[in-house]
Amino acid sequence: ILQDKKPIAIRVPSNGVVHTTEKVDEEYSYESKYKVMHKGSEVAIIAAGSFYQKGENVVRLLADKGIDATLINPRYLNEVDADTLEALKTNHNLVVTLEDGCKDGGFGERIASYYGTSDMKVLVCGVKKGLYDRYNVEQLLKDNRLLDEQIVEDVLALI
């Protein structure tokens, strides 16, 4: 990592280490710029943090249904990338946000708020607000419609 102007944090992935052939960013001056990993149309998946692999899975499942969805890695969650979000308006009807945290006041709601006065539909996928202690992860995902297949069902119902 070549960035030496600001603090950094290296996170240990909670969902395991996944091999990728994607080039690793060495420089981080793009703070509020999202990275479009795959450019499609009609549906855009913005998958944050440990839910990025879930985003890849959802895009793959949508492709099996004939939908070439855009996949975006937001990289930073503190600000919206207005340029990228505006560009999606040209050939997308639905933006889906995936986050492994609480939806209330989270990243997805920020994206929904950005599109509030436009015709863009936004599906915010995250965990409902609550106190979760000693829970089964699969059951929590299922209860919040966060299983890959459930997300695809919800997308298909909206387009």
Regions found by a protein language model. Give the residues of each.
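Thiamine diphosphate
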Residues: 2-159
